[in-house]
Structures are given as C-alpha cells and as structure tokens.
C-alpha cells in the first residue's frame, strides 16, 4: 500500500505570505502544495482532484462532493491505494538480482526494502501480537522474576559471565542498549541488596563510562567499529564514580574470602571471588589508561603491565568454572535465565539499529578477553620506542595483530599520544620529530655539540621546518591512521599521501638552504662547518622514506581487502617492483651511507686532534679494534625489501605469463577500460612530485616489451625471481613468522612456475587459484 498525497483545498487567506522552502527534487504532489501556498491569487479549483490520478476513485468522488471537507483536520490528506497487483506485475519484469532505481527510490530505499521483514535484519519480526511487553526493572521485581538479595553462587556466576559476554558484544560494535542494558540489574544497581551483585553491576556501569571516554579521546573508531552513543539516561540514573570502584570490589572480595574460611565447600564461592578479582584488575587497567590521557608517567605503564599479568593468569581458572553458573536456556535470546530482558529496548531504538543482536557465548567471550589483555600487554611496549621510525614500525605491526578490537587500538593511541601535540604524554611532538630525524640519519645540524648547531640562521630554518611538519599533521596523522580498522586505513592513507608533497618541497628547500650556507661558510674559511652542511639530503630522505612506506601500505592493502580483480594483479605488482620498493631501498641505503661518512669523518677528526697533542705522544698507542662494527642499522630492513622486490617481480612476470597463456579471465572489452582502472588505482600518487606519477602509456609500453617474450621464457623469469626471494629469505638470521610464510610462498611458486615452463597442463587453460591465506600481500599460486 502506497500513500497518495493530495493538496487540500485550504483557505487562501491562511496560506498567503507563507514561505515554503523546497529541495530541488521533491514529489509532484508536494510541489503542487508548495505552489498553492506561495500563490496569492490562486483559485480553489485551479488544482483539480482529477489531476491527481493516483488517488482511489472513491476518494476522488468524496473529495468532489465536498462532504469530506468538514472532516479534514490535517494537511495534506492521504488516500491509500492497494497496488499489490501492479507491484507484482512490475517486479516480474526484473531479473533475479536486479534493483529498480528511480528518483524517489535509490539505493538507500532499496536496502531498506531488502531488510524489511528479514528476521536477521528486522528486529520487529521477532515479535508476535500475543507477546507481552518485555518487563522493566520495576515490573520484574513486582513479579518476582529477579532476585535482589540472597543470590546463590551459581546465580552470581551466571550473571557475571553473561555480563562479560554482553561487554564483549558491545566492544564488537553492537548497540549498548541492545546488549549491556538488556541486563535489568544495570538499570538501578543501588536497589540491589546483594552486595556482591551490586558492586559488580556498579563496576560494569563505570567501566562503560571509562571505555567510552578512552575510545572518544583516541578518535580512531568508525561507525562499524563501535556504537559510542546509547541511552544516556540509563547511565545518568546513578552518578558514575570510577575512583571508588576498585576499593568496593576489593572489600567484597575480602568479605567472601572470610566467608569461605567458615565453609566446608568453597569452590563455588571462590569462582565468584575470581570473577570479582578479574573485574577489579580489568577495571584498574582501563581506568589507569583513561587517567593517563591527562597525567602520563612511565611508572603508570609499568604498573599497568603488572596488573595485566595478574589478570591474564586468572582467566584459565575462570574458564574452567563456566559450568558452575546458571546457563542460558535453549531457544532463548537471553544470555542468562534471570536478570535479562533481551527485547526491552527494541522498540526504543532509532532506525539505525534495525538488526537483531546475537550475544556472544561465554567461552568465546572469555577467549576474546584473554586475547584483548594480551594485546594490552603488547601495547605497553610502545614506551620503549622513542623515535618516529621505531614507533611507526610498532604501530604498523600492532595494527596487523589488533584485528577489529577498537578498545585495543584506542588503548595504544592513549599510551602513545592522547594529545596529538605530545608524544608519550609529555614530549612535545616537534621535539619528538626533531629527535626522530636525528636518530634516523643523524644530521650534524641537529647535534647540539656540533659547532654548526650554534648558527642562528641554521636554527631558524630548522625551527620553521619542524613547525611546518606539526602544522601539517602529516607525521602524527600517519601514526593515528594505524589505529583505525584495516579498511578505513586505506581510505585515509590515500588522503595522507597527497599531503606529503608539500612537506617534500619544504624538506628539499631546507636541504638546499643548508647547501647554500655551506658555500657561504666555505667562502668565509670555516671548513668544518662547511663540511657538515655540504651535500645535505637528510631531511628530504627522511620525508621521502615515510612517504614511500605510506604508498606501499596503501597499494598492498588492496590485496588484504580483496579489492583487486585477478586481471589487475599485473600492474599492481609491477609498480612496487619497478619503482616503489627500489625507492625504499635507495632511501635506506643513502641513509646508511650518510651515517658511514659521518663515522669516518668523526674518526678522522679524532685522529687529527689526538695526533697534534703532546700528551698523546707519551701515551701508548691504542691497539686497533678488531672487526669494528660499522653503523648499518637498516641492513635487516634493506634485505627484507630485497626479498619483497623479488616476490613482486615474480608475481609480475607470473601474471604476464598467465595472461599471455590464456589462463587469466579478462573482462569483456565492451565493458572494460583498463586505462580508467589503472588511473583509479594509482590516483593518490598523481599529485606527488617525488616519485613522479607513472602514466598508463608508460606502463603499457613496459608491458608490451615484456610480452614479446615467449610464455615459457616468462614462466622461467618468474621462477628466477621467486628463487632469488627464497635465497634472500633463507639468508636472514632469526626470521620471524612473516618471513617464514614468505619463504614458503617463494618456494611453492618457484616450483609452480617451473612446472608451467615445462608445458604442464598446456592444453587445459584454467585460471589458477591465488591463495592469500599465508600472507595478505602475496598468494600461493595453485594449479587446478
């Protein structure tokens, strides 16, 4: 049934002079009503009822007769028409999977229509007309559905476990009202007489407030991660006092322990104590993290790590006593038989929450909490990383391990920098970046002991550069982006890469000024200062390295998110093989060479100074150090990038061979424009001056040159690349799990390419399977 809108014949005197603002696209009937409202000399019969042909004929006759005029109390008036037959006839013209689209029926309306009356999406489908309204807290007390005092250990354990399950379901992105506040005890904990239950429910309410604050301050959540807002009135009923929760939980624990000493069988009560103790430690950790946003000390982080160790040790014992609590009833949505009303807030939810919620089961909820605590412990290690290079590496690695847990990602952001202007809570970000450049490639101008550091002109240029870096927020935003979920990271990296161009220009300008100052000091006869400033590319190298990393993460994340079609793999692997990884290796190699040159210059200066002093002649000559280790801090990373370079080369040549061999399904030419797809994939790189954008014509020329080789040669070339990657990875000492996975991929693909080069399955042109289960960026090629 569709409503039809009719402009009622209203008195012109009441409508004259009224202002009606209309959007550019609106219904014809509404347009007629708006025109009637704006016209000052409009006759009543100018808009005839007959023009509104979609109205039911009976309604039209009634309107013409004027008998309904006295009954009109609302403007406009709706006449309902049964369009079921017409609707079914129109739908018969659509093929399965097709959607109708109209100016008034777009994708939003289509998705709403699909979800309506689907039991998995439409929460209203779970109701029957005979269902009684879900009981409120007061109604449940009146009917005796819940107990407020003298709860047994089994009942307490069941409620505790159910609340932990609801907490985990909330952290997974579900509505707070539909999971946590289905527990009636959370609505008014002050009315609960049982102290163990009252204190636990109060702790949960305060935990909700603290978690919401941490996530809001960290600001790395999106709508699919976490529902930050809920029914605030439920939380406002009792004022949150997080500072008193810890002592209250400890008092209840002590009382129950004293009670256990008087009992013969204590297993059930000790299971209650363990859950209270775990809640106390969990709350203490999260509350400390929230407080560190304003008062950050290293001691707090050490305390947090110790508390996390205790909490993680308690979880195995709790999981072993899950069967001691009351269990959910079969066929019921409630996580516990007593104290929960799953549908209490369904009718009060806004349209944004139409779906039915399935609360996690208890074993998997405690598994989630155990993994979350492990991530918290890992996040505490961020305090060891005092420069941007190592901190960024840690954030990238943590992003891969944190998964979809928004609280874990928010805790890391808070531990590192709750304020974007401060690193580790107390170090100004400008000073942090300055120290990071010094650690990365040690520019002499940043060395306080070097004479060039006293030059006011040099310091002014440095101050302007780092102030510009802070104002642009590019480097701080790069770290913050690593806190978002993996899908959102790619979208935000695309915008971040565009910002690097202006900083690259500023860094190049700074290096140029340093070289200019070097020439001026040389003309003045100040050779030491001129040598320190000459050929300075420190700042450009640092900026370019971080830009290249952002580009590589952006490009390769498309494989993890399954955004690329198989026929696109060719140019996706080609770009890092031909350009990006080579740029990264070049930047790191140049940095190492700078460090080596500075080391040699320092040794030369030391020998010159010691050789000229008389005291040095009387001392015994120092023995030369054997096998002196030179500064090569980036050697391991360079070797790893060489392995990635060979893997990208192998995949690029393999995709070329498979395409030429007819084993890759290509889109139909009339539906395909490869140039458009290519430009869209590399669109964020188009604004950069370094590296310069690579046009589709350049890629096409390179591909045509490669495709001149025979299929067998291309398979052989791909096998050689995979073999090179295997050799590089096998040479790495103490490889981590990622390197071992890449080694297995290189070995397997090497064998597959050799098999295809010898003509295996030459007559069967099936597209191979690309298995990304081992690694997100590089697949194992499997022949079918």
Swiss-Prot record:
Keyword Transmembrane helix belongs to the record: no
Record localization: Cytoplasm
One BP annotation, GO: negative regulation of apoptotic process
Keywords tagged on the record: Cytoplasm
Region called Disordered, residue ranges: 1-23, 320-353, 606-630
Chief localization: cytoplasm
One Gene Ontology term, aspect cellular component: cytoplasm
Basic residues biased stretches: 617-630
Chain's role: Auxillary component of the N-terminal acetyltransferase C (NatC) complex which catalyzes acetylation of N-terminal methionine residues.
Subunit text: Component of the N-terminal acetyltransferase C (NatC) complex, which is composed of Naa35, Sbat/Naa38 and Naa30A.
Entry similarity comment: Belongs to the MAK10 family.
Name used for this protein in its record: N-alpha-acetyltransferase 35, NatC auxiliary subunit homolog
Lineage: Eukaryota, Metazoa, Ecdysozoa, Arthropoda, Hexapoda
